[in-house]
Amino acid sequence: MWRIWRLFDPMRAMVAQAVFLLGLAVLIHLMLLGTNKYNWLDGAKKAPAATAVAPVPAEVTSLAQAK
C-alpha cells in the first residue's frame, strides 16, 4: 500500500479528495433544499385546505317574478 504514494503526491490527493467531498456536500444540500419535505429554510409548505364546493342554488321563481 505504501507504494501507491510513490505514484501520487499525498498533498495533491488530499486536496483533490477535500474538493470532491465539498462539492458532493454542496450538491446534496442543494438537492435537499429543492425538495418540499427537507427544505429547512422555508419550512415544509402546507397543503392547501380542502374547501367544500357548495352547489349554486337554483333561482327562486317567486323572486324572479317580483323583479
Swiss-Prot record:
One GO BP annotation here? Answer: photosynthesis, light reaction
Which InterPro entries does the record cross-reference, listed alphabetically? Antenna_a/b, Antenna_alpha, Antenna_alpha_CS, Light-harvesting_complex
Entry PTM: The N-terminus is blocked.
Q: Where does a bacteriochlorophyll bind?
A: 29
Which residues carry the post-translational modification N-formylmethionine, per the record?
1
Classify the protein's membrane topology as the record does.
Answer: Single-pass type II membrane protein
Q: Name one GO molecular function term.
A: electron transporter, transferring electrons within the cyclic electron transport pathway of photosynthesis activity
Q: Which UniProt keywords apply?
A: Antenna complex, Bacteriochlorophyll, Cell inner membrane, Cell membrane, Chlorophyll, Chromophore, Formylation, Light-harvesting polypeptide, Magnesium, Membrane, Metal-binding, Transmembrane, Transmembrane helix
Q: Tell me the superkingdom of the source.
A: Bacteria
**Membrane-side (Periplasmic) residue stretches:** 34-67
Q: Which residues lie on this side of the membrane: Cytoplasmic?
A: 1-12
Query: A Pfam family in this protein?
Result: LHC
Parts of the chain that traverse the membrane: 13-33
Naming one, the record's GO cellular component terms include: plasma membrane
Q: Where in the cell is it found?
A: Cell inner membrane
Describe the subunit structure.
An alpha/beta heterodimer. The core complex is formed by different alpha and beta chains, binding bacteriochlorophyll molecules, and arranged most probably in tetrameric structures disposed around the reaction center. The non-pigmented gamma chains may constitute additional components.
Assigned protein family: Belongs to the antenna complex alpha subunit family.
The function of this protein is:
Antenna complexes are light-harvesting systems, which transfer the excitation energy to the reaction centers.
> Would you tell me the protein name for this molecule?
Light-harvesting protein B-870 alpha chain
Species whose genome carries this gene: Rubrivivax gelatinosus
